C-alpha cells in the first residue's frame, strides 16, 4: 500500500536489557540488500527503568559502563564486565559517531540527559516516541537529533508523557528538528497507516 521500505527495530522484552539489539532499513520490493546502515535500539525512561532495577539513574550508570568496557577502561576479564565479546564488537561500531542509536524515550528531562550523555560519549542518537521532545526542541535542533513521533499520541499515557499533544511534530519542525513518524504500538501491520498519521500531523500545524 505504498510502503517501499521499513526500519526493522529491536525491542527490549521483560527481564531483558535496556539494549534491545540491532535493526536496519530494508526494502520491500523483494531485494535482500539492506537499504541503509544498522541501528542500535535502546529503551530508556520509565519503560527502561523496569529493566534497570527500577532506577532511571541506573540506566545511565549501565550505559556509561558499557562504553567504558568498549573503550578498555574496564577489562573484558573483569568479573564486573557486562558485555560479551560480540557485544563489545557491536557497540564499538556506534561510538564516536560511527552509527546511530535509536532511543525510545519520552520525558523532556530524560531527553535532556540523553543529549548530554550523547555529547559526552560522542554518540549519534535518534529519538523514538518523544512525547515531550518539543520542550527541548532548540537543543535537539542544535544537536541535529531526529525525532520519530506518533502524530496521534496526545494523551498522558504515563507520567513520562504528560506533555503529549497533537502538535508535537509541528513544534519540533518549527524549531528545525528533523521529524519522522512511527506508530506508538510499533505494530508492523499498521505501517500502512503512516501516511494517514502524516496527514494528522499536517492537520495540526506541520
Feature locations, PLM:
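Polyanionic/metal-chelating signatures
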Residues: 2-125
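Hydrophobic residues within beta-strands of alpha/beta enzymes
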Residues: 6-8, 147, 180
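Active-site environment of divalent metal-dependent phosphoester hydrolases
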Residues: 13-17, 108-112, 130-137, 155, ...
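Short secondary-structure boundary/capping elements
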Residues: 83-86, 106-109, 132, 160-164, ...
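His/Asp/Glu-enriched, well-ordered alpha-helical/loop segment
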Residues: 100, 141, 150-154, 159-206
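Catalytic beta/alpha-barrel core
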Residues: 102-107, 124-132, 152-158
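Glycine-enriched alpha-helix->loop->beta-strand junction motifs that scaffold or abut catalytic
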Residues: 118-125, 141-148, 176-178
Amino acid at each position: 500500500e505504498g510502503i517501499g521500505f521499513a526500519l526493522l527495530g529491536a525491542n527490549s522484552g521483560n527481564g531483558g536489557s535496556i539494549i534491545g539489539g540491532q535493526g536496519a532499513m530494508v526494502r520491500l520490493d523483494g531485494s535482500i540488500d539492506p537499504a541503509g546502515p544498522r541501528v542500535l535500539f535502546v529503551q530508556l525512561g520509565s519503560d527502561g527503568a523496569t529493566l534497570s532495577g527500577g532506577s532511571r539513574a541506573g540506566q545511565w550508570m549501565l550505559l556509561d559502563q558499557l562504553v567504558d568496557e568498549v573503550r578498555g577502561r574496564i577489562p573484558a576479564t573483569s568479573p564486573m564486565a557486562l558485555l560479551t565479546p560480540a557485544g563489545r564488537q557491536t557497540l564499538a561500531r556506534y561510538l564516536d559517531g560511527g552509527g546511530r542509536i535509536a532511543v525510545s524515550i519520552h520525558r523532556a528531562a530524560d531527553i535532556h540527559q540523553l543529549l548530554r550523555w550523547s555529547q559526552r560519549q560522542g554518540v549519534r542518537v535518534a529519538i523514538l516516541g518523544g512525547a515531550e521532545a518539543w520542550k527541548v526542541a532548540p537543543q535537539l535542533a542544535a544537536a541535529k537529533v531526529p525525532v520519530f513521533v506518533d502524530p496521534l499520541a496526545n494523551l498522558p499515557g504515563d507520567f513520562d508523557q504528560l506533555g503529549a499533544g497533537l502538535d508535537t511534530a509541528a513544534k519540533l519542525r518549527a524549531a528545525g528538528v528533523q521529524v519522522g513518524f512511527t506508530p506508538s504500538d510499533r505494530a508492523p501491520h499498521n505501517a500502512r497507516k503512516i501516511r494517514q498519521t502524516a496527514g494528522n500531523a499536517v492537520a495540526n500545524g506541520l
